[in-house]
Regions:
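N-terminal start and proteolytic maturation junction detector
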Residues: 8, 28-30, 62-63
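Active-site neighborhoods and metal-handling regions in enzymes and metal-associated proteins
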Residues: 49, 53, 57-343
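Short linear motifs in low-complexity or flexible loops
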Residues: 23-24, 34
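Residue-level detector of structural "landmarks"
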Residues: 13, 18-21, 27
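Intrinsic low-complexity, disordered N-terminal segments enriched in polar/charged/small residues
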Residues: 2-6
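Cationic, low-complexity basic patches in intrinsically disordered or flexible, solvent-exposed regions
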Residues: 27, 31, 38-41, 47
Length: 343
């Protein structure tokens, strides 16, 4: 499940804000150097600490122009200061492996059920029952978020069809048609650890464009993963993903990003799917995060629908996404959510 990117607008361009939210005055006193929320203005555009929200990544989007905050649905409920999600003990590694294996098994199970005429709500129910009854896991998206006028996510999986970029809500009214491209995004909690992964499916016979977009998007994900090792930078990963997508005349959605993950669903760092080589956070052994590029067949511009969750392409052209959860190892990486077909 993607994290919405935290950005600050400073003319003439967009910049990533290293803070996920603006700390309160009380928090700032405990952590000198952070910016403070005061009467809806940043006191200083200086960021010394990385903050994260353990509740809802959509609640922590702040955009500023000339210091002023422009946003919707802000509702800070629970915050914690941490630099990055890390898997530091053998118990943590085993926990993440088990959670990742469970998440992958849901995608392996659901494939045969993706057929024309099936509703996305039916797919959700099949996945929910499998996650809860067969895997003894918790579906992390169910009732996730909420507050500040935004409803909690009402289903156990995300089903994003055709021009839906991400966070599509399963519905009994959404019946798959022949040729539909569908991303199913799964996040499970097993013994306190999260496994987060997604895959593209097709209902019936898909178009050549849909198949090509899905293939290139999966390649983008792997090109990013292949660069993961201690000493690499997140900008290297983003650049590799962006370069491959644009070389194939596709575009990268920039409003959503990968995220740190372990015992917290959405944690630091923010893993951008675009960027410049040699920039960004330096990877260290034990860091765990997702890489989950969203690639559009048309322009990268998106909008959020009135349900406050579903993101769609503005030009209504196709979008695709693939996702894995992985960890930085001593000499490379380990993917926790590999499926049988990938091994």
């Amino acid at each position: 499940m993607s994290r919405i990117l935290t950005v600050i607008f400073l003319s003439p361009g967009w910049f990533v804000c290293p803070n996920s939210h603006v700390p309160t005055s009380e928090q700032a006193q405990k952590h000198p150097g952070t910016c403070v929320e005061s009467d809806k203005f940043f006191n200083r555009l200086q960021f010394s600490y990385t903050a994260s929200c353990a509740v809802n990544h959509r609640d922590i989007t702040y955009m500023a122009r000339r210091g002023a905050i422009y946003t919707t649905n802000i509702f800070l409920k629970e915050t914690s200061f941490r630099m990055v999600a890390k898997v530091e003990t053998e118990i943590d590694i085993l926990g993440m492996r088990e959670a990742g294996k469970c998440a992958a098994s849901v995608l392996e199970m659901i494939g045969e059920h993706v057929q024309p005429g099936v509703t996305t709500d039916h797919l959700n129910q099949i996945c929910h029952d499998f996650i809860v009854n067969e895997l003894d896991c918790i579906p992390a998206p169910l009732n996730y978020g909420g507050g500040g006028g935004q409803m909690p996510f009402p289903k156990s999986i995300c089903t994003s069809v055709n021009h839906v970029v991400c966070h599509g809500i399963p519905s009994p009214a959404k019946k798959l048609k022949n040729g539909d491209a569908l991303n199913i995004d799964i996040t499970v909690i097993k013994n306190g650890y999260h496994g987060d992964t997604s895959k593209m499916f097709f209902a019936g016979e898909a178009s050549i464009l849909a198949k090509r977009l899905s293939k290139i998007t999966q390649e983008c994900m792997y090109k990013g993963i292949e660069l993961v090792k201690p000493g690499a930078r997140l900008g290297d990963i983003g650049y590799a993903i962006q370069s491959h997508a644009e070389a194939n005349r596709f575009s990268v959605v920039r409003e959503f990003c990968g995220h740190g993950i372990a015992k917290v669903f959405h944690d630091e760092p923010q893993v951008l799917h675009y960027g410049r080589p040699g920039t960004g956070v330096v990877l260290e052994e034990g860091m765990s995060f997702t890489i989950e590029p969203i690639i559009n067949a048309g322009k990268r511009n998106i909008k959020i629908l009135p349900d406050q969750w579903t993101a769609v392409t503005k030009d209504h052209k196709l979008s695709a996404q693939w996702e894995h959860t992985l960890m930085v190892t001593k000499d490379g990486f380990e993917i926790f959510t590999l499926r049988q077909e990938e091994q």
